[in-house]
Amino acid sequence: MNIILFGPPGAGKGTQAQSIVKKHNYFQLSTGNLLRDEVKSKTDLGVDIEKLISNGKFVSDEIVNTLLRQSLTNLKYRDRIIFDGYPRNVEQAINLEVLLNEFNQTIGHTIFLNVSRDIIEKRIMGRMTCEKCNMTLNEYFNKEQIELHPCGVEHLKKRKDDNLEIVISRYDTYMSSTKPVLEFYSKNSNFTEIDGAGEIDQITNKINEILKV
């Protein structure tokens, strides 16, 4: 069964998705990673995406849907996909249903990690990602791990779009645009809301219990 993980930027969707991948042999389809890969490719589309992200804006549905379709046609895992960061609005939710129907697939569980803006601010402003191994640490919560990071502290970098004004803008935009999507999926009995402010392991255990159902 496929899964959708909802939650504002910094809610820990990526961390939880990685846990599901390891434990349940899922494939993580992150629109954030798709967009960043396109930016790294230096294509014209990638340049446009970088401008939008740097200004705290979301890219258009047309761009996201194009990248998503390209990925779906290359997926090796049927009915074992975690959609991380998609859909963001009702139009995308409808588009996802259409795409999955083309591949004879459906959504088995929809999970919303609910986290307040105050906590999100600290999580994102302190977030650092290793440019070599992609490990993510937080300067507020992982000071010892940062000092002992095997790749070296010099490889831990902050993302360009991680500044307070943009964090607030992204959070408010996400919550306002995603509310209709949550209402769209909450009508389904497979929709679950989880307090995303807890410890990572506690949240992981809750998700594992959901996936057993």
From Swiss-Prot:
One GO term (biological process): AMP salvage
Compartments reported by the entry: Cytoplasm
Pfam families named in the record: ADK
Disulfide partners: none
UniProt GO cellular component terms: cytoplasm
Pathway participation: Purine metabolism; AMP biosynthesis via salvage pathway; AMP from ADP: step 1/1
Region feature NMP, mapped onto this chain: 30-59
SUPFAM superfamilies: P-loop containing nucleoside triphosphate hydrolases
Domain of life, per lineage: Bacteria
Keyword Glycoprotein assigned: no
Catalytic activity: AMP + ATP = 2 ADP
PROSITE patterns: ADENYLATE_KINASE
Residues that, per the record, bind AMP: T31, R36, K57, F58, V59, G85, Y86, P87, R88, Q92, R159, R170
Binding, ATP: G10, A11, G12, K13, G14, T15, R127, G198
Main location as per UniProt: cytoplasm
GO MF: adenylate kinase activity; ATP binding
EC nos: 2.7.4.3
Region of interest called LID, as start-end residue ranges on this chain: 126-162
Keywords: ATP-binding, Cytoplasm, Kinase, Nucleotide biosynthesis, Nucleotide-binding, Transferase
Function text: Catalyzes the reversible transfer of the terminal phosphate group between ATP and AMP. Plays an important role in cellular energy homeostasis and in adenine nucleotide metabolism.
Domains as described in the record: Consists of three domains, a large central CORE domain and two small peripheral domains, NMPbind and LID, which undergo movements during catalysis. The LID domain closes over the site of phosphoryl transfer upon ATP binding. Assembling and dissambling the active center during each catalytic cycle provides an effective means to prevent ATP hydrolysis.
HAMAP family noted in UniProt: Adenylate_kinase_Adk
Family statement drawn from the similarity comment of this UniProt entry: Belongs to the adenylate kinase family.
Protein's name in the database: Adenylate kinase
Organism: Pelagibacter ubique (strain HTCC1062)
